[in-house]
């Protein structure tokens, strides 16, 4: 053991890092600690599967849209809640080798995929423990994220609270959500209406939007230009390697969809894809009445529940012409 490694080990011991590593609070900051979601070096050494038929990218909309369980297809869901388009692109660049020639790359298109999202420490933290080489999945603040991942006591009050809970035997998983695993919608109509309004209000605050039908703000226009270039790079990356990129717009409930005016959809969704200017297949389920009118397929006004995900996934695969057994 080198002197540097010995010093780091001593520092981690006396800072409580080894105990903090065991806490649910610490584990909840990262994706794929079990190395089962992404085919990093740990996954590749433990699995023989290769030549996958399909992967999907995306943020929360993609995470809660696709479920390949029980379907005779080799596929992976690489979406996270949240996940930026840059992170989608970098995940694909690192892990695309798992795809077979001609494999599908489903790119989930959400209402604000065309606007850039500000990122911070926690965005970089998510991917720190993926076993990869080269450029990090989220390069912004990555070095700081590495330090905080190694020495979580740097989070100060949060770390101390987590450590105390652990030592008192009160450590509980803090990232488990039962709602997405349900086969029904736990919300009634009034709750769904309020939930939809919360999403609309949250998006307006996040992106500085007063009126969805108004022109883009200067900041969002700059973000749009960046996202246009990034999507072009992602599409070109797929096509240069013989993969088939596909845009997929998942459905939402009528409670939320009614706020998507034609002007809003053109400005934030279809206008963005037109600006990208690539000839990509678009599977658009935003107007699909089977999904839009059936609240029981969701766990809130926005995201599909387990039953909805399985139904939607089969529908997408069938529309791609993939034969299911």
Language-model-derived ranges and their functions:
Residues 2-31, 141, 145-167:
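Membrane-proximal basic amphipathic "stem/tether" segments
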Residues 10-80, 85-95:
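Membrane/wall-proximal cationic-aromatic binding patches
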Residues 51, 100-104, 242-244, 279:
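A general structural motif
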Residues 56-57, 61-144:
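Membrane-embedded segments
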Residues 89-91, 224-232, 262-272:
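Well-ordered, non-membrane alpha-helical segments in soluble/globular domains
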Residues 122-241:
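Secreted/periplasmic serine-hydrolase-like ester/acetyl group-modifying domain
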Residues 235-260:
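Active-site segments of SGNH/GDSL-like serine hydrolases
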Residues 262-263, 267-325:
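C-terminal regions of proteins
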